[in-house]
């Protein structure tokens, strides 16, 4: 007889190899055909909801790993919440307006000047929608489930109308105004920028010290003294109208070789060193506070203009001279302090950053090129004390990567000052996973200036503002709502297709327009106002969603972006934050923590990972990251992820193979009748389940990744599944011992598949389709396992046993190295108590020790004279006695010796007898 034919070997059609790149699209097609997203919602439609509001990615360009990280974690969250019984719709969105799309069309050869604004905008729209189709397909390929057939898009008429109405409510509250203020201005984009559109890079700049002669000392300083200022923007000197000093700082008039200079005393040594003064030749002649210097008049170094000495709290002693060059047309602090003194706002640059006629001798020069001309003129006037060059962190346009400037222009603003405290209070009411997230957005709101919301572009939502003949601004509830209604019906292109009069309510009149003529605003809204209105355009508009959302989750750059603009508009109009919980992730770097770039050749993109390895590998990688900070990816990291995946897959396959003849309805053993080792594993499963559920609740996916590996490697592979082979393969098919183990194995398989489902979406579905007797058609329509109390006493007992078993394994390994045994079934374990542990008494509680140790024989003694001492007993390993059973390979002294049952141990004889 071939005894192999009598073994109950694993059987399953579940393949060992994943073949994910080919298999995943088939599974996704099945989900689409079954409309699984709708089924998942329908299942929980009467339950409490959980709303994760999708921050809209920009509809331009292919997906990068940051997109994948973001969308995959969102999918973890929504799928988990759905399996926990929540009604959890997920509506993906796209941000579609703004300069990058205009630039993309220009690169494609679209000549904006050869068409009307409305025609150009139509091309922008077509481009954006094509980009959305590409990105949508790629997001779905990552296994992300959502309402992709009905996403929200910021260019749709209903969204734009909601945005206009929100704008109108802010205007009604006096939060929208027009003013000439210095704003971040990008000459390369020819537009103003919000703080969220600024990024900092190193830049080499001129560093100059300039002397301003005293013109009218007011009897406070010597008339032949000079104020020294320091600046890294020489091109702003033509706009200088003041010198700001701190009212409480002490200043000194210093005589240096007959020259009299005024600087802050706290900075005098640094100034002396910078200007190369001989310390022995410096004399402090006079002292005064900044307050005492107020209203002293200095002379502009090369213009016929007074530079007034004023007081400002923003002056520090971190660098410079303590006497701050002040040009209200080119700096926010300068502008604010200048307002108090009614100083003129001079900003002689055009949109391209080129000096206008107002710039005098610098007319026609690009501001950066004017630096040299200004310093040359200062030198000519003997006002330049020092010219140097420094490299410092400087604001750049996030799109063009070119430097920006502060430039005073007429702009539309949303007032932050009027709602700042309300926003800060709303942040206090918001939950955060990490304290630094709260600190970050709190400080940004606390410190940010007014929000410039106008842009001098065409591809965006028009500002719904009209002007009367006399220049009066028309922005009433009636006119704004009428524009919103028009946008909702026709889309915002109507603004560029119709005259102002046609966009106003029928019969509208205004005292400032006696002839009934009106003009319309040409600026559009900041794209952050677009996406920052999504709580109105989506949460409050879509019937399946609600305000506020339970969660906003985006990259950490959104503390100054979408998180910021959203809470600003929500607090301004609804008096509360649009999110209950705020969570963020870091950026994706290469394997060495460097930024990915084509030039370095270290770029990995989602499409490449999916085609080569599969979306589940990308998803498992995401779960393996500490996403709260920057994460790393490389071919080597993905190889490690693939190895972990293979281990998970093979473990699930092993369990599938060993329950092929098990029906939980008829073959299950009641928990009280399970073997104790099986009850131990059931309780370990419950511990693992409780921990995994807790980790999902706390968005701790790295913990899940690590604990899954630990459970599979330590509990299953290294013990239970290895131990179980002697039972599952060898025992009689329906023996109590075998059915006891299959009962627990089935539970482990089902629960693990559910717990892994939000992460390994395709593999879990594949396992589910091969699992016999499951009720739900899809694992994603099943519920998460319930958290059940564990038997602590049982776990404590078996945890001690597992530690003891580790000692036995160490002894077996030693015996293997010494050639006493080969495989562990060749061993007899002799074990006894020692001073550190009463092994003999402890092991009296356990049966079938030879199976638990995976050896042929175990002898427990009070004392082992020739054993090696371990923490949990003295252990001696011998070669097993007797001969090897040809069926189970255990050694015994009771081998059969007759006919069919020859060379079989008594246990195998009993099993085979039933088969003959």
From Swiss-Prot:
UniProt remark on cofactor binding: Binds 1 zinc ion per subunit.
Positions of short motif 'HIGH' region: 57-67
GO CC annotation: cytosol
GO terms of biological process kind: isoleucyl-tRNA aminoacylation
Cofactor(s) this protein requires: Zn(2+)
Alphabetized GO MF terms: aminoacyl-tRNA deacylase activity; ATP binding; isoleucine-tRNA ligase activity; tRNA binding; zinc ion binding
Compartment(s) of residence: Cytoplasm
The protein's Enzyme Commission number: 6.1.1.5
InterPro entries per UniProt: aa-tRNA-synth_I_CS (IPR001412), aa-tRNA-synth_Ia (IPR002300), Anticodon_Ile_BEm (IPR033708), Ile-tRNA-ligase (IPR002301), Ile-tRNA-ligase_type1 (IPR023585), Ile-tRNA_ligase (IPR050081), M/V/L/I-tRNA-synth_anticd-bd (IPR013155), Rossmann-like_a/b/a_fold (IPR014729)
Main location: cytoplasm
Binding site for L-isoleucyl-5'-AMP: 554
Binding site for ATP: 598
Keywords: Aminoacyl-tRNA synthetase, ATP-binding, Cytoplasm, Ligase, Metal-binding, Nucleotide-binding, Protein biosynthesis, Zinc
Catalytic activity: tRNA(Ile) + L-isoleucine + ATP = L-isoleucyl-tRNA(Ile) + AMP + diphosphate
Superkingdom as given in the UniProt entry: Bacteria
Residues that bind Zn(2+): 885, 888, 905, 908
Motif ('KMSKS' region): 595-599
Cited Pfam families: Anticodon_1, tRNA-synt_1, zf-FPG_IleRS
Function (record text): Catalyzes the attachment of isoleucine to tRNA(Ile). As IleRS can inadvertently accommodate and process structurally similar amino acids such as valine, to avoid such errors it has two additional distinct tRNA(Ile)-dependent editing activities. One activity is designated as 'pretransfer' editing and involves the hydrolysis of activated Val-AMP. The other activity is designated 'posttransfer' editing and involves deacylation of mischarged Val-tRNA(Ile).
Similarity field: Belongs to the class-I aminoacyl-tRNA synthetase family. IleS type 1 subfamily.
UniProt cross-references to HAMAP family, sorted A to Z: Ile_tRNA_synth_type1
Listed PANTHER family: ISOLEUCINE--TRNA LIGASE, MITOCHONDRIAL (PTHR42765:SF1), SOLEUCYL-TRNA SYNTHETASE (PTHR42765)
Domain comment as written in the entry: IleRS has two distinct active sites: one for aminoacylation and one for editing. The misactivated valine is translocated from the active site to the editing site, which sterically excludes the correctly activated isoleucine. The single editing site contains two valyl binding pockets, one specific for each substrate (Val-AMP or Val-tRNA(Ile)).
Subunit structure: Monomer.
Name of the featured protein: Isoleucine--tRNA ligase
Organism, as annotated: Staphylococcus epidermidis (strain ATCC 35984 / DSM 28319 / BCRC 17069 / CCUG 31568 / BM 3577 / RP62A)
């Amino acid at each position: 007889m071939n005894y192999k034919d009598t073994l109950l070997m694993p059987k399953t059609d579940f393949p060992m190899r994943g073949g994910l790149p080919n298999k995943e699209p088939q599974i996704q097609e099945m989900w689409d055909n079954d409309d699984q997203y709708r089924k998942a919602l329908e299942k929980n439609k009467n339950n409490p909801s959980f709303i994760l509001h999708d921050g809209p990615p920009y509809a331009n360009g292919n997906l990068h790993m940051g997109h994948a990280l973001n969308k995959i974690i969102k999918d973890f969250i929504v799928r988990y919440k759905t399996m926990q019984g929540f009604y959890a719709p997920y509506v993906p969105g796209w941000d579609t307006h703004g300069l990058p799309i205009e630039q993309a069309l220009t690169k494609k050869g679209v000549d904006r000047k050869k068409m009307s604004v409305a025609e150009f905008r139509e091309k922008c729209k077509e481009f954006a929608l094509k980009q959305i189709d590409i990105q949508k397909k790629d997001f779905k390929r990552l296994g992300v489930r959502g309402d992709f057939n009905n996403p929200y898009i910021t260019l749709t008429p209903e969204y734009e109308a909601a945005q206009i109405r929100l704008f109108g409510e802010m205007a009604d509250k006096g939060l929208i105004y027009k003013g000439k203020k210095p704003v971040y201005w990008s000459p390369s984009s020819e537009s103003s920028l919000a703080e969220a559109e600024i990024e900092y890079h190193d830049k080499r700049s001129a560093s100059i010290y300039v002397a301003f002669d005293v013109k009218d000392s007011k009897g406070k300083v010597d008339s032949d003294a000079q104020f020294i200022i320091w600046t890294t923007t020489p091109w702003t000197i033509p706009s200088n109208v003041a010198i700001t000093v701190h009212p409480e700082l002490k200043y000194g008039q210093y005589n240096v070789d007959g020259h009299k200079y005024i600087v802050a005393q706290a900075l005098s040594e640094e100034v002396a060193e910078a200007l190369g003064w001989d310390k022995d030749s410096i004399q402090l002649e006079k002292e005064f506070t900044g307050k005492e210097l107020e209203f002293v008049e200095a002379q502009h170094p090369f213009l016929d203009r007074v530079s007034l000495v004023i007081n400002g709290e923003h002056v520090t002693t971190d660098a410079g001279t303590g006497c701050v060059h002040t040009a209200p047309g080119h700096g926010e602090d300068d502008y604010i302090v200048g307002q108090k003194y009614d100083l003129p706002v001079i900003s002689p640059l055009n949109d391209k950053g080129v000096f206008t006629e107002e710039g005098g001798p610098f007319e026609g020069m690009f501001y950066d090129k004017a630096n040299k001309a200004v310093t040359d003129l200062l030198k000519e006037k003997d006002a330049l004390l020092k010219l140097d060059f420094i490299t410092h962190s400087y604001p750049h346009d996030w799109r063009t990567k070119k430097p920006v400037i502060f430039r005073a222009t007429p702009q539309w603003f949303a007032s932050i000052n009027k709602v700042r405290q309300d926003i800060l209070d709303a942040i206090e009411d918001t939950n955060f996973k990490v304290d630094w997230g709260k600190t970050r957005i709190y400080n940004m709101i606390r410190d940010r200036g007014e929000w410039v919301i106008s842009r001098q572009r065409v591809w965006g939502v028009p500002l719904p503002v009209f002007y009367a003949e006399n220049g009066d601004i028309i922005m009433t509830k009636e006119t704004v709502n009428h524009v919103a209604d028009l946008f909702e019906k026709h889309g915002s292109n109507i603004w560029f297709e119709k005259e102002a009069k046609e966009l106003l309510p029928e019969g509208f009149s205004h005292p400032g327009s006696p002839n009934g003529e009106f003009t319309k605003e040409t600026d559009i809204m900041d794209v952050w106002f677009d996406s920052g209105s999504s709580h109105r355009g989506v949460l409050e508009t879509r019937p399946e969603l609600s305000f506020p959302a339970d969660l906003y989750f985006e990259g950490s750059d959104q503390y100054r972006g979408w998180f910021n603009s959203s809470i600003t508009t929500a607090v301004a109009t609804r008096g509360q934050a649009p999110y209950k919980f705020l969570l963020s992730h870091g950026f994706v770097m290469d394997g060495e923590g460097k930024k990915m770039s084509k030039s370095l050749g270290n770029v990995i993109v989602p499409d490449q990972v999916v085609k080569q390895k599969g979306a589940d590998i990308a998803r498992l990688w995401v779960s393996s990251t500490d996403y709260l900070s920057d994460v790393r990816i490389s071919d080597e990291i993905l190889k490690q992820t693939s190895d972990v995946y293979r281990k998970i897959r093979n473990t699930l396959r092993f369990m599938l193979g060993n329950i092929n003849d098990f029906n939980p309805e008829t073959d299950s053993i009641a928990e009280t009748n399970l073997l104790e080792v099986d009850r131990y594993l059931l309780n370990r499963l419950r511990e693992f389940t409780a921990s995994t559920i807790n980790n999902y609740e706390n968005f701790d996916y790295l913990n899940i990744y690590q604990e899954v590996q630990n459970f599979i490697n330590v509990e299953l592979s290294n013990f239970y599944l290895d131990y179980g082979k002697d039972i599952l393969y060898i025992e009689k098919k329906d023996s109590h011992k075998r059915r006891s183990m299959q009962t627990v194995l089935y539970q482990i398989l089902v629960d693990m598949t559910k717990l892994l489902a939000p992460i390994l979406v395709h593999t879990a579905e594949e396992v589910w389709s091969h699992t016999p007797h499951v009720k739900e058609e899809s694992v994603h329509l099943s519920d998460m396992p319930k958290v059940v109390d564990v038997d602590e006493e049982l776990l404590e007992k078996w945890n001690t046993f597992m530690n003891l078993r580790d000692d036995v394994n160490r002894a077996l390994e030693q015996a293997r190295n010494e050639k006493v045994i080969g495989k562990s079934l060749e061993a007899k374990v002799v074990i006894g108590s020692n001073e550190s542990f009463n092994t003999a008494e402890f092991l009296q509680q356990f049966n079938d020790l030879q199976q638990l140790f995976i050896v042929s024989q175990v002898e427990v003694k009070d004392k082992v004279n020739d054993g090696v001492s371990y923490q949990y007993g003295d252990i001696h390993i011998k070669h097993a006695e007797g001969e090897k059973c040809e069926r189970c390979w255990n050694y015994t002294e009771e081998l059969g010796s007759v006919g069919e049952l020859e060379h079989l141990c008594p246990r195998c004889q009993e099993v085979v007898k039933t088969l003959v």
